[in-house]
Amino acid sequence: MAKKVFVKTFGCQMNEYDSDKMVDVLNAAQGYEPTQDVEEADLILFNTCSVREKAQEKVFSDLGRIKHLKARGVKIGVGGCVASQEGDEIIKRAPYVDVVFGPQTLHRLPELLAQREALARPQVDISFPEIEKFDHLPPARVEGASAFVSIMEGCSKYCSYCVVPYTRGEEVSRPFDDVLVEVAGLADQGVKEVTLLGQNVNAYLGKMGGTAEVADFALLLEYVADITGIERIRFTTSHPNEFTQRLIDAYARIPKLVSHLHLPVQHGSDRILMAMKRGYTAMEYKSTIRKLRAIRPDLAMSSDFIVGFPGETEDDFGKMMKLIDDIHFDNSFSFIFSPRPGTPAASLHDDTPHEVKLRRLQELQAVINANIKSISESRVGTVQRILVEGASKRDGSELMGRTECNRVVNFAGHPRLVGQMVDVTITEAKAYTLRGEVVTADHGALAAH
């Protein structure tokens, strides 16, 4: 009987990708199969995130909840960014943990588990061995028509509030050919949509075929678009400073590049942006969006916002709200500033009451939610191209898929539509989703009847 591994993932899409790779590595090396039931697992892994406040305490709290499972011989591992930050401290506080590993050493999981058995003591490896992990990962196993592909690791921007360079290392790009081989392999398995991942994906500079030449992100997009079977290309996360004219022009050259962009701005006040060490002004950010929308007028924008950064005044907050009004964001991920240990911003004087920060966050989210509602309602009556992902979470008898602009659409349809591209007429706008009716279906798949 195959051993079972349960993986709990916290945080970003990079972590989702890494969690899938953990399962692939363990399956190839030791025959582990994934399970969604922690009670039947032989191995439990937490893939952690340290971006938000109290992330470490959350991990130790969750570890405490599964400690009782050690009685039947379950192995426990902690990976991800909290593992990188805490290292041996995790073993000191939770000595029942068997292995601790960082984002760059997940490929060593089978080896670490074997050493845990042989040496009868916990193993810790949170080193940064460049891009080595990608050389040791088995071919991806995918289910469905959409997949993530990591093209680079780390970040070299060192924004004053951000812990990523310290937990994932500086920017290292995967070789150009390696990325294309992975995407082509996914296309052979029926994947139609790929999301290219990196902490700063548009800073990509991949070596080409063992030569001294390097490919930038715009060139990588062109080659990915040429791979047979790939119909949609997404990417996240990008940095405004690396949004070059070549990358902007790619939106004119590459129809497969979706009209949806997540481009974190973080704030709308130049004073706060400077304190954050973001390296651009609000006007420069808006200029990039204007250029993009000159090419793609229907480009949907989402972003990240930090409210209550140390020293933020009502005037600063007002400038952020004006930027939101100017851009008309389609969605956002917005948070109250939380100091991360070891970052420059953690030592900044912060005298803004929490109640004020909370009020500002609520105001910001109210405006974004109004934008979401308005944009969703404007889609009613239009025909949207949908990639069908599977059963609807609202109603298992229906299907769900995503528009090019990343809106979830629920609709009645035959299960054979899963994995296909279909045209759907939008009939109703819900709070965060749309409803629709199938118009056509590719490849002879059947609409509901």
Curated annotation (Swiss-Prot):
[4Fe-4S] cluster 2 binds at C155, C159, C162. One of its GO terms (cellular component) is cytosol. It is found in: Cytoplasm. Binds 2 [4Fe-4S] clusters. One cluster is coordinated with 3 cysteines and an exchangeable S-adenosyl-L-methionine. It catalyses: N(6)-dimethylallyladenosine(37) in tRNA + (sulfur carrier)-SH + AH2 + 2 S-adenosyl-L-methionine = 2-methylsulfanyl-N(6)-dimethylallyladenosine(37) in tRNA + (sulfur carrier)-H + 5'-deoxyadenosine + L-methionine + A + S-adenosyl-L-homocysteine + 2 H(+). PANTHER family: CDK5 REGULATORY SUBUNIT-ASSOCIATED PROTEIN 1, MITOCHONDRIAL TRNA METHYLTHIOTRANSFERASE CDK5RAP1. Belongs to the methylthiotransferase family. MiaB subfamily. This is tRNA-2-methylthio-N(6)-dimethylallyladenosine synthase. It comes from Paracidovorax citrulli (strain AAC00-1).
